[in-house]
Amino acid sequence: MIGRLNHVGVAVPSIEEAKATYRDLYGVPASAMTESRDMPEQGVRFAFVNVDNSQIELIEPLGDKSPILNFLEKNPKGGQHHVCFEVKDIYEARDAMKAKGATVLGEPRIGAHGTL
């Protein structure tokens, strides 16, 4: 049912500090990181770190109603927030997972790549 790993979402208190960590500690060149962009409809600011065969999405809260704030309250240094796999039909995949007992936290929505 699942396809290729598209990206791993990592909630962070500061995208710029996280980028510095990926650059200085892990050796990721600055050219492999995108500029930060705001997604106000989801209450997040995001940037991507491009690594071989995938991406890491850095997610910072945007505004005081950001769902990422709750995550960071429990995990102040940040951490893995989600894993994104590509599927042919998101609704079919969701329904199949629910039928097998999976908990689905919300409806599919347009993400940072502009896709469901």
PLM region descriptions:
Residues P61-S66:
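Short, conserved turn/kink motifs that form compact alpha/beta structural patches or helix kinks used as
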Residues T21-R23, P67-F71:
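Short amphipathic alpha-helical segments, especially helix-boundary/capping motifs
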Residues L5-P13, A47-N50, L69-R94:
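Vicinal oxygen chelate
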Residues I2, V10-Q55, A93-A102, E107-L116:
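Core segments of cupin and vicinal oxygen chelate
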